[in-house]
Each structure stands twice: as C-alpha cells, then as structure tokens.
C-alpha cells in the first residue's frame, strides 16, 4: 500500500473506508479539538498557505479547489480573497459541518462530495488546488498527486499543508511525546473517539518526510517544487507549479 495505512486495513479501499468512518465520528467536535490541540496555531498555518498562494489568488478569474476540505477552514480562508472557492471531501458529516460554517459567514464557496483520487473535474480546469492535513490520509499518495496534476492548468499551483516529522532530533523527541502520549488522551476526551487521535501520530510517523514528498511531487510532474517547515518542523508546506 502506498498511502494511509490504518491498523487492520489490507487494501486501499479498506483504508479509505476506515478514514471516512473515523472522520465521520469526530466531525461534530473536530474544530474544537483541532484548535485546542494545536494551541490555535493551525489558524496561522492556514493563513500562511493563503499568503504563499497569493499570486494565483490575485488572478481575476482564478479557479480554486480545496480537497479533503473537512469542516471548511481553509476554504473560508481562501474565500476571504473574494474568489468563489470549491471545496471537496469524501466524508459527508464533515461536509455538513462545512456547509453550516460557510452559510453562517455567507462565504463565496461551493462544496461537493468526492474522493480526492477521482475528482469529477475536467483536465486542466483549475488554477490552484490546496489540501490541509488531508493528503496524509489518502489511500494512495502517488495517485493523489497525479490527480492534482491532472486538474491543474499550465501556470497553476498545488499547495500541500501537512504534518511531518521535525528535522531536529531533540525537538522531534519532545513533539512525539506530546503527539503519542498526550494528544490521544485529550483528543479522545474532546471528540469522544480516541481512535482518531491515536491514528494521527501514527499516520504522521508513516508519512513521507518533507524532502521525500517534494521528490514525489516532482515525479508526478510538478515543477519549481519547494517546501518550508513551520513551527519547528511539525508541519511542512509544499508548493509545486505546472509549466
């Protein structure tokens, strides 16, 4: 398997089914858990993603899609620039939460239910595709990159914001102590599902390191691939262009 590997999943289909069910169980408390467990720094990470994609967002007719959009936080951040942003996710309860937030804020956004590996979009139809903390959960990372590449126009950009292993060994040890011992306990109390927050650090441990993910993006056809570590390297933001 070349993607997310939840315990007990033997195929990509089983992995996707497990991830969909897990997010469905925590959707009602997902935002609260995220903000508390990240000490609200997740808002900064998304804002940084928007800033790094500004040149695309400044285009008057830019078409923008956030895949694995969850409860819509990055969709809302992107929509603040005035664009009608698309958001997709394959977990229905997460989309229900996103719809509610978008309606309350009257944001220019349209959501649809779809697996990120099989987007119902034409080739070369987008200028920007983003994903925040969802790429790691895909059942096949290479297929996800190829699909992102397929729907981008020449001159378009992909932005992947994802947890990663900190490059500093000492800091990584401290972070892993928090992620493996404290985070599952608190996340379980908040969300009612400890499984989701036990899966999180394990999935980060198995996820390709930032330099490896950059190489995978190049292999999928992206050019000018760069990445930056944020907050001591617990998160990395990857950018890649289509020439």
What does each model-identified segment do?
Residues 29, 39-61:
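Conserved alpha-helix/loop element of class I SAM-dependent methyltransferases that forms part
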Residues 1-31, 179, 190:
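N-terminal, positively charged/glycine-rich alpha-helical extensions of SAM-dependent methyltransferases
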Residues 30, 129-130:
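Hydrophobic beta-strand segment of the Class I
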Residues 142-157:
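A short glycine-rich, Lys/Arg-flanked "PGG" loop and its adjoining helix->strand segment in the class I
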Residues 164-216, 220, 226:
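C-terminal alpha-helical "lid/dimerization" subdomain adjacent to the S-adenosyl-L-methionine
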